[in-house]
Regions:
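Short, well-ordered beta-strand elements
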Residues: 310, 422-424, 496-506
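Signature of long, low-cysteine stretches enriched in small and polar/charged residues
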Residues: 442-494, 546, 550
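Sec-dependent N-terminal signal peptides
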Residues: 2-33
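Secretory pathway targeting signatures of secreted, lumenal, and periplasmic proteins
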Residues: 384-387, 391-444, 478-479
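Short beta-strand segments that buttress and anchor functional surface loops
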Residues: 271-279, 312-313, 411-413, 471-480
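Signature of exported/secreted
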Residues: 39-46, 73-79, 84-86, 90-388, ...
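Surface-exposed amphipathic alpha-helical segments
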Residues: 336, 340, 345-349, 398, ...
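N-terminal propeptides/low-complexity segments immediately following signal peptides
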Residues: 31-65, 555
Length: 558
């Protein structure tokens, strides 16, 4: 029976591997050649046969809302992305993990978390070449005050970070990542069994999000407890959705986690956690082995002990081998993590100081190139161009695979399936009085696509309320033997700053892609219109689709 939890965590889990890709960028320059789809307008694009089954199988799994109608010269509101609705979840085939008590309660603790990783990462180097392999070592540490609030509507947490840092070493190259001063007051919600960290008044960068997300997140540790009295040496299975959340994967195909009460002494219990899991993450297979212990308060005796959360200490060793996906390298690593939770009496004062410091830092950092402000919420990521040529808040299903002087390249991955690819390129500045016309954009596209060009399906021009003009041209054509669709956007602000955004996808995935290109464009801010004008509208009432933990009716492991 396949078990699945989805909600972003698995797509971003073991986030230091994303950092590893950046550290060793030259080594991965030719990663995944069999599924590469180039967005350079003048280059031929041939989709690999190997990509189609996964995408088509996943497309059958969900049917997002169709794209909205085409604008023709109307005035648009300033950036205000509204994401396509999530498909109706599959009915659960087995019960989910037991929910915590619902009476409203609040508790503040200090949590210290350490993660040490060693192993290797690998990526394909070509059809006839062996994978490129690089050694990796990670040293990550976290120290924060966590206030957990449990209500009838679920669990939320506020984390005030004293420290959050990681050092990643790949093949001798080192990169240090630390949570910024203006991003240390973090809110966390549970989307199913996936902890989703976010800022209340802004947006985290992908690097920050990757840093904060780890296996065995402290917010999930209580899901290891049985919720009933148990005797020493008695074992119980950990619910499938909780196990997937703890391991930060999408699907458990076989195996699982099991907990066993080992000792009860002086009001304290020790629980052993073991398991072997085969599943999938990001649409690729993964194999995980787990062995560890957790310590928790207990009442009763060795014949009938009631384990009372929260878990105060966890020591876990993991071994995972995960195949390379469309957006990240594969890895074969061993990890050791330690989490220690202690009650904290001065939480209120520290939280107030943290919030004050965050607000002050946000004020100092106003403007293009600084963190995008606005109503933050889970499922959105901020990207600031290194040269301050644009600013972007986007759906976290877009994954960056290249970020350099020539532009930004992202892939849209929905439930493990590669749906589309996008390039964002800053163009030379133009006279503000003469933004490119539809005819000029159409002519340039037809020339650059050359033999791939088929026909222009639709062209439109619109102006946002912040003064940014957008030319949008949708083109149908062929790449190899497959019908493709290219959607080109050229954005121009009042000061003449220009940005080209091109999305490409197979026509068979058009419905699944929906309005993702429009939502991406809505999140872009250019220097001439200022980041703040876009920031306040990014937090639209409609959030990204909740990808909550659930059990599908059948396996979706490739």
């Amino acid at each position: 029976m396949a078990r699945r939890t989805s909600g972003g965590m698995a797509r971003r889990s073991w986030g230091w591997l994303v950092v590893a890709c950046l550290v060793a960028a030259p080594a991965w320059a030719e990663s995944e050649p069999e599924s590469e789809v180039s967005l350079a307008a003048g280059e031929p694009v041939v989709a690999a046969d190997g990509d189609r089954p996964a995408a088509e199988a996943a497309a059958a799994e969900a049917e997002p809302a169709a794209a909205s109608g085409e604008p023709t010269g109307e005035t648009l509101a300033a950036p205000e992305p509204a994401l396509a609705s999530e498909p109706t979840p599959e009915p659960a085939a087995e019960p989910a993990s037991p929910e915590p008590p619902t009476p409203e309660q609040e508790q503040t603790d200090r949590v210290r978390f350490k993660l040490d990783v060693a192993g290797e990462i690998f990526a394909p180097a070509g059809r006839d070449a062996p994978p490129v392999r690089r050694p990796i070592v990670v040293d990550a540490r976290f120290d924060f005050l966590e206030t957990v609030r449990t209500t009838e509507s679920g669990i939320t947490a506020r984390r005030c970070y004293r420290d959050a840092a990681a050092e990643v070493r790949v093949d001798g190259a080192s990169r240090a990542t630390r949570l910024a001063d203006d991003a240390r007051d973090i809110s966390v919600v549970l989307r199913g069994t996936t902890p989703a960290p976010h800022l209340e008044g802004g947006f985290l960068s992908r690097e920050e999000l990757d840093l904060l997300e780890t296996p065995f997140d402290p917010l999930l540790l209580d899901r290891l407890l049985p919720g009933r009295s148990v005797a020493v040496a008695e074992s119980w299975p950990v619910a499938a959705d909780a196990a997937a959340g703890l391991l930060a994967i999408d699907t458990i195909e076989s195996g699982g986690l099991e907990a066993t009460l080992e000792t009860v002494e002086n009001g304290e219990a020790t629980v052993k956690v073991t398991g072997i899991v085969d599943g999938a993450a990001d649409g690729v297979p993964t194999h995980v082995t787990v062995e560890g212990t957790v310590t928790v308060n207990a009442s009763g005796d060795s014949t009938a002990a009631m384990l009372e959360g929260p878990v105060m200490r966890a020591e876990v060793a993991l071994r995972e081998r995960r195949e390379a996906s469309h957006v990240s390298p594969g890895f074969d690593v061993e990890a050791r993590l330690t989490a220690v939770r202690t009650p904290h009496a001065d939480a209120g004062r520290h939280a107030a100081e943290s919030a004050s410091g965050t607000t002050a830092a946000a004020r100092v950092g106003a403007g293009m190139g600084s963190r995008r402000q606005g109503t933050g919420r889970p499922g959105f990521v901020w990207h600031g161009d290194a040269a301050s040529r644009y600013d972007l808040v986007y759906d976290d299903r877009w994954r960056v695979i290249e970020d350099g002087v020539e532009g930004l390249v992202m892939r849209f991955v929905d439930r493990g399936a590669l749906v589309a690819q996008c390039s964002v390129t800053a163009l030379p500045r133009a006279a503000s009085q003469s933004p490119p016309s539809i005819a000029e954009v159409e002519r340039d596209i037809e020339k650059s696509l050359a033999g791939q060009f088929g026909r222009i399906e639709h062209s439109s021009e619109a102006a946002r309320s912040d003064g940014v003009r957008i030319v949008r041209v949708a083109v149908a054509g062929r790449a190899g033997d497959l019908p493709f669709r290219w959607i080109h956007h050229v954005l121009t602000d009042a000061a003449g700053h220009r940005l080209a955004v091109t999305c490409m996808l197979e026509q068979s995935l058009e419905k699944r892609f929906g309005a993702a290109d429009r939502e991406l464009i809505d999140g872009i801010s250019l220097p001439g219109n200022g980041a703040d004008s876009a920031a306040e509208t990014v937090g639209a009432p409609m959030g990204p689709p909740d990808r909550e933990a659930r059990v599908p009716s059948e396996s979706r492991t490739p």
